[in-house]
Every structure is written in structure tokens, then in C-alpha cells.
């Protein structure tokens, strides 16, 4: 499954968030909670055979004096975590349906192949290793203030093979418009070339090297170009670009995080970003 971003343009105004799990109680009294699942199901219902394991930790808006606001946020979160077809469901129903589908797909897809392999092969242990599946989707609200909410989704999956795959996605939501915040909303004009240069310089500093070639010799920018991407988050120190495995470096190097300080990117920031960064830095003090 690919974790997708759904752009929701919702008519909502006049609500303000505070840090933590509860927003301004005098406004919409919005609170967040989570639903956990840890489900293991074996092929043919036989505990001696391989199994799939699904772990979910889904963060959602649990309460609000404005029901439409709560439902709109949850539709956004559900779509981002599980897919568009779940966005109209309640969080409880969506998690239940997603779990049922994962288990059903696992058994329907693999039981016929496993049965055939059992008939053709003698070594059951070598068969089982390739049929043990795993998926984890865990989300939480990473940042919340009067202007922005950052929702983080950590995803990992194993479907046989040498290793699994994992990724983290960050959704930055403008709380005044309830729409995603993109780089184009934060930087002035043609910012990409200058921002790319800053990313290279910071990555060199992080790795104690002085040239791009040295970074490439280490493995960076060998699986993809190092450039600004929409997978980023903001905190009191600056903006962090998060490159998942394979995006700019081999799997063995893991994910790459590059943080640019607000001071370094100040010449590129537009007015909205200046206000936003000031609020985030104030909250972090």
C-alpha cells in the first residue's frame, strides 16, 4: 500500500489549536485519542503454519464541540493512513474494516500458493519463511499550535524477500484553511535551486565532508536526486526534510533527515513562513 495524501478543501474557520492533545477548550474542545490493533492470523487457521501480523496505532480526533470539524479531520487522517475508501467511515469502523481486509487478502492470496508449495517441497521451514507477512501503520500528532498541525505516519511492511520496507510521512495542515501546507506556500519565488544548495551544504556538514563527491562516494544521491521534497516537518530548530529509504540512498543507509535552521533559510522564507516559524519557536521555548 502507498500512503497517499488527500487534499481536502474544507469550509472551516475560527478554530485554534494549542500544544498537546487538547485544543482551546473555549473554542471547539478538540481532543485526540488512538486505536490500537495487534492481530496475528495463521494460514488455514493452523498455528503451526506461517502467519501475518498487523499492528495499527491510529491517532484521531475523539471529541469536539464542533462535530463537523472532528469528522473532517478524521476523514483526512483516515485517507492518509488507510486510503480514500475509508475516509467516510468512523475511526473504529475503518480500523476494523482495514484489519479484516488485510487478513482476508493474506489468506486468499497465499493459502493456494502455500498449499502447492507444501505438495512440491520437503523442507517446510524454508517454505514458511517466505509466507510470514507483517505490516505496521502508526500515527500521531507531532506538532500542534494555533497555526499548524503536523500528523506523522510511520509505515512498515514485510511481504517475503530479503527485507521489509519502511517509511515515514509527514502531513502539515494549515489550521486556518484545513488544507495541506506545501513548500510553495512557505518560500518566495524560484526557491528550489537555492534550497537544494543549502541541503547539500547541510548534508556535508552532518557527515563531516567538504564536497558533494565525498557524499556520493558514501552513497548519497546514488538512488535519487537530492532536492527539496514535500515530505518535511517544522519544529523550533527549523525545517527538516525526511528522505525515506531508496529516495536518495541505498536501503542499508536507512532514512536521511536534513534539518535547515530558520536562520539559514530566512532569505527564502515568505511572510506566512516567517509568522509560522515564529509561532513554532515561541511554543518551543
Label each residue range with its predicted role.
Residues 19-169, 175-285:
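Compositionally biased intrinsically disordered regions enriched in Thr/Gly
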Residues 1-29:
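Bacterial Sec-dependent N-terminal signal peptides
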Amino acid at each position: 500500500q502507498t500512503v497517499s495524501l488527500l487534499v481536502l478543501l474544507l469550509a472551516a474557520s475560527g478554530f485554534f489549536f494549542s500544544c498537546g492533545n487538547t485544543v482551546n477548550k473555549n473554542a471547539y474542545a478538540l481532543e485526540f485519542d488512538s486505536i490500537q490493533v495487534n492481530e496475528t492470523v495463521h494460514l488455514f487457521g493452523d498455528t503451526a503454519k506461517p502467519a501475518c501480523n498487523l499492528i495499527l496505532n491510529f491517532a484521531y480526533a475523539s471529541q469536539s464541540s464542533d462535530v463537523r470539524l472532528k469528522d473532517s479531520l478524521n476523514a483526512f487522517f483516515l485517507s492518509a493512513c488507510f486510503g480514500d475508501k475509508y475516509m467516510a467511515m468512523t475511526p473504529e469502523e475503518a480500523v476494523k474494516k482495514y484489519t479484516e481486509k488485510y487478513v482476508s487478502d493474506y489468506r486468499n492470496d497465499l493459502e493456494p500458493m502455500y498449499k502447492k508449495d507444501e505438495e512440491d517441497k520437503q523442507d517446510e521451514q524454508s517454505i514458511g519463511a517466505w509466507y510470514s507477512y507483517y505490516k505496521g501503520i502508526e500515527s500521531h500528532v507531532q506538532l500542534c499550535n494555533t497555526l499548524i498541525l503536523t500528523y506523522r505516519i510511520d509505515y512498515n511492511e514485510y511481504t517475503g524477500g530479503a527485507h521489509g520496507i519502511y517509511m515515514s510521512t509527514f502531513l502539515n495542515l494549515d489550521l486556518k484553511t484545513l488544507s495541506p501546507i506545501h513548500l510553495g506556500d512557505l518560500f518566495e519565488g524560484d526557491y528550489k535551486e537555492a534550497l537544494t544548495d543549502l541541503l547539500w551544504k547541510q548534508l556535508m556538514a552532518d557527515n563531516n565532508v567538504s564536497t558533494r563527491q565525498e557524499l556520493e562516494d558514501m552513497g548519497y544521491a546514488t538512488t535519487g536526486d537530492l532536492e527539496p521534497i514535500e515530505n518535511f516537518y517544522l519544529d523550533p530548530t527549523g525545517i527538516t526534510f525526511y528522505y525515506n529509504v531508496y529516495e536518495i540512498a541505498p536501503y542499508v543507509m536507512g532514512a536521511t533527515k536534513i534539518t535547515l535552521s530558520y536562520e539559514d533559510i530566512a532569505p527564502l522564507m515568505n511572510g506566512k513562513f516567517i509568522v509560522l516559524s515564529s509561532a513554532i519557536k515561541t511554543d518551543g521555548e
